């Protein structure tokens, strides 16, 4: 069993972010500690949603509280997804650094959520460059979709050959 710090969104309607990650990871035996970046009515890809972005200072305070309980040294993996505000990037990168300082074997898996090929970008304009320039370089593993891979690599990803070229 691994301990996973999952820093992602929560939605009431639908299954994305922590609303999609926590239960399946628990079902396969992992302990998951969710920290929310937003608490939205639904996925932003619908075009309209309600609910708050969680301030970066609140996210940092939650992680600090976990550290004060000795939890960060027990983290085996950090998982991040939908950022919400652009100030969350610093909190995530800092949390990863704290975890890795306490457990050098811990890994960081980043889902660089930006959008998709069908509906385009559904995050604020500040998020994609932050993901590309700050968050993704801190990751051991990234899980971009086709749209996100194209943005991150500045390539046109349209088929298997172009996908393989982009990840090479």
State where each predicted segment sits:
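Conserved N-terminal subdomain of the carbohydrate kinase-like
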Residues: 1-117
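Short, solvent-exposed loop/turn segments at secondary-structure boundaries
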Residues: 16, 46-48, 119-124, 153-157
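Conserved phosphate/ATP/ADP-binding segment of small-molecule kinases
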Residues: 123-168
């Amino acid at each position: 069993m691994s301990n996973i710090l999952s820093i992602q969104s929560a939605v009431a309607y639908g299954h994305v972010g922590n609303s999609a990650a926590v239960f399946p990871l628990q079902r396969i035996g992992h302990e998951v500690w969710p920290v929310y970046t937003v608490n939205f009515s639904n996925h932003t890809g619908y075009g309209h949603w309600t609910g708050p972005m969680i301030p970066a200072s609140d996210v940092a305070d939650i992680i600090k509280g976990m550290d004060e309980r000795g939890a960060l040294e027990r983290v085996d993996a950090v998982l991040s997804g939908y950022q919400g505000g652009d100030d969350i990037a610093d909190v995530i990168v800092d949390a990863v650094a704290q975890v890795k300082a306490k457990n050098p074997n811990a890994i960081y898996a980043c889902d660089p959520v930006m959008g998709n090929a069908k509906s385009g970008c559904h995050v604020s304009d500040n998020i994609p460059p932050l993901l590309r320039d700050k968050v993704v370089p801190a990751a051991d593993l990234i899980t971009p979709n086709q749209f996100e891979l194209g943005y991150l690599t500045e390539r046109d990803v349209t088929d298997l050959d172009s996908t393989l070229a982009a990840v090479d």
